[in-house]
Amino acid sequence: MKGQMTKSKRISLIATFAAIAAILDSIPGIPQFESGVWYSWIFLVVPLFGFILGPVDGFLSILIGVLVGHSIYFRGIHEFLFAIGAPVGAMIAGMLFRQKRSIPIIFFTVLLASYFLTPISWQLPLWGMWDVYLAFIVLLIVTITTFNKSRLLICTFVGLEADILFRIFLLIPLQTYHLFYGFTPEAMKIIWVAGAFVTPIQVGISILFTMIIYPPVQKVVQRTRDNGILSSNTDST
């Protein structure tokens, strides 16, 4: 009975958070953000869900949310593929938040290497991905130091940049910029420059949102989990 109750609570939490994600992903962002990575408001909760639900459940809740959100606010069939970046970001954020650093490091290393081994990347402004480089450097630093005091900030930043890097991996190494959208290298240069300014603003907004929202939301979720455990113990006696 206890195991069933715990599973029921888990499914309920995933469904609840997925509904929130779907709402945020179905609301268009402000026009000034269109040159950034995210076209909706899903970026606000990507790392937050990874922290609260954990890497796996955070991934699932965001994945369900963006699939529903993209169906409501349709951005093109190809965007469903790029939407996977959001749950990946939640997973990486959740792992790092729980001090699991090996997979995030491998993720950043492999995807960055793939990017620089792709010929078109040599034609794009090197500084256009400055925020991704910074996230990788921060990730390497926290592997040899403790970061409890700034854990929330660091994990939020790295999780969002993991989302961005995954989308870049789809766009450049997998060459969907040409296969899906027919972009030329010249067009990609413009996109890279614009994204270098807009996307970090979105990241900053998400960091501020997470720092404010995480503590109260975590308390509510923890209380829900505790109540579920208490209820299951009561039922089993």
Task: For the regions a language model picked out, list residue spans one by one.
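Loop-helix junctions at membrane interfaces
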Residues: 1-237
